[in-house]
């Protein structure tokens, strides 16, 4: 808390960043007063986030949650999935990062202009197919027809994310789809 202003970390992708940097989440959030972590992004829990901070902050958050009707009954099954995510899924994030690097390298082999020279640090690969948002949406639609789901970002940018359900075969088929679209027969 600097100058009396508490600092909060939105840790939606904190585990990915920690694995990529070789740090613990504790080290990453050491200079903040509170942090949330998402258990579904990358960690494969069906739902859930965890809020951490000083005891008085957590007590106040619980009160506000109850006032807003956020109390969840019979949450043991969801909590169990969250525990599995925390205990068993963090280590495998490095596999997602490695597949993102492989995807990035394969895309650069097809068209070097598509991706920056630097490898991605985590599991997100950005591909600039054009400078036009309309062209990016066209690529998105054509890739979807080939079974590859991507998101469009800013003008001409596609965003690909690797995760537990993306294996080496999926990376290969994604690269094949991009190659077919880049060089149609």
Where are these regions (language model features)?
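Conserved PLP-enzyme active-site core in the AAT-like
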Residues: 1-133, 137-146, 151-166, 174-185
